Amino acid sequence: MVLMILPFVGPVSVSESLVAIITMCLVYMILKFFRTEIPEGLCQLPGPKPLPIIGNVLEVGRNPYLSLTAMSKRYGDVFQIQIGMRPVVVLSGSETVRQALIKQGDDFAGRPDLYSFRFINDGKSLAFSTDQAGVWRARRKLAYSALRSFSTLEGTTPEYSCALEEHVSKEAEYLVKQLNTVMETDGSFDPFRHIVVSVANVICGMCFGRRYDHNNQELLNLVNLSDEFGQVVASGNPADFIPILQYLPSTSMKKFVSINDRFNAFVQKIVSEHYTTFDKDNIRDITDSLIDHCEDRKLDENSNVQMSDEKVVGIVNDLFGAGFDTISTALSWSVMYLVAYPEIQERLYQEMKESVGLDRTPCLSDKPKLPFLEAFILEIFRHSSFLPFTIPHCSSKDTSLNGYFIPKDTCVFINQWQINHDPELWKDPSSFNPDRFLNTDGTELNKLEGEKMMVFGLGKRRCIGEVIARNEVFLFLAILVQNLRFHAKPGEPLDMTPEYGLTMKHKRCHLRAAMRSRNEE
């Protein structure tokens, strides 16, 4: 989310500043003069009164998920704020969001034309692109087909049901050994530091068919790039909401463009290598699967949209970026919750011991045997809401929602955090309670409750990698719970306060872990 527009602009002269201010004032007055007329029978959107030029940015503050949730209590599930000079509609409430993204999915399937979006994946990103026409739909379908093909790809040995299970299981087992080694040498570990490298390795294996040593510089460069991307996006780009600022120098924007260029170059190099060694009869990873689907499309005379080779680079870029940050953040929060609630950690271990045993590695087929673990994961998604907003949507035409008129090309924020903490949906939403996702006797997941939780978006822009992400989090966590007991480092209080960003992360800290004995009760 790009919700902060406080000045992150490089040095400019006094005359340039005056010209920018005068121009913005003129544009603001023109926009006020040409206000959109409200069709008969519809109401004007409610919301706080904006200040000239900066809009409601001061009221939104540095924790938008909290301030916008508070505003929804005052103005309702559909209201409007102004960020800079751009009107933004904020949607809250499960029924309202489902109405917008599912029942009126075509009306809200767009992406706003934000300046920074043009530089993500050279403006061709599946997730951020403003396009929603035939080419975008074809690329999304191609990406989904490649993911599905890869998810059913056989592992190298019969003990793994698929390639995904093999990649995750091997990396999770290595992570257990790594944490045990670090504990012996250092006495504590940074959960995010080790988890993020492990997840990056899984994504590299899935997308590129290669695994790195945890100290490999190329792998660490990827991790650092992702971290830099998150930091720059979290700080915000004022030009997204005050367009005139895109013509002024900006240090943060230069850094943002550089990060995207470096990552694009990395992916381009690996995809080029895959084209050179591609064998249709030996699909090694998601990149091969994408190339295979592209080749089939080129041979299909009935295909309306042909896929160029550069589209493969773009899709791989998207899949890598999306899967990497989301999964590593989810797993890092998982370990924090294990430490914060030791009685829940022990209950998870007992379920693992009784239902799966300690003599083999948990697998995806064990999911039905581990309902409390599944409920624990759902409650982490809900309680942390580490993805507080979806990527901004945009109205693709003049439309209405809950009786309010929403003009075409209006930027729309979906407040997932509010939905996941809505007291009308959840009993005592501020408490961490995995049992809320189980049936009355605690033996099965309550699927209806699980469907209320929102973290991967909804509708036409829903995350296409959701199933893979959920499976990866499950496997990683199952293997960690089976083998390690996590606890806090003495003298270092556990701080669960989220730090706002594209994904909300906990504060960096050090924890302890101990290998569990196979004879442990």
From Swiss-Prot:
The keyword Heme applies. One of its GO terms (biological process) is cellular response to xenobiotic stimulus. Its main location: endoplasmic reticulum. Pfam families: p450 (PF00067). The keyword RNA-binding does not apply. It is found in: Endoplasmic reticulum membrane; Microsome membrane. It is a peripheral membrane protein. Substrate binds at residue 229. Its EC number is 1.14.14.1. It is an enzyme of class 1 (oxidoreductase). SUPFAM superfamilies: Cytochrome P450. Heme binds at residue 463. Its cofactor is heme. InterPro entries: Cyt_P450, Cyt_P450_CS, Cyt_P450_E_grp-I, Cyt_P450_E_grp-I_CYP1, Cyt_P450_sf. Belongs to the cytochrome P450 family. This is Cytochrome P450 1A1. It comes from Sparus aurata. The gene is cyp1a1.
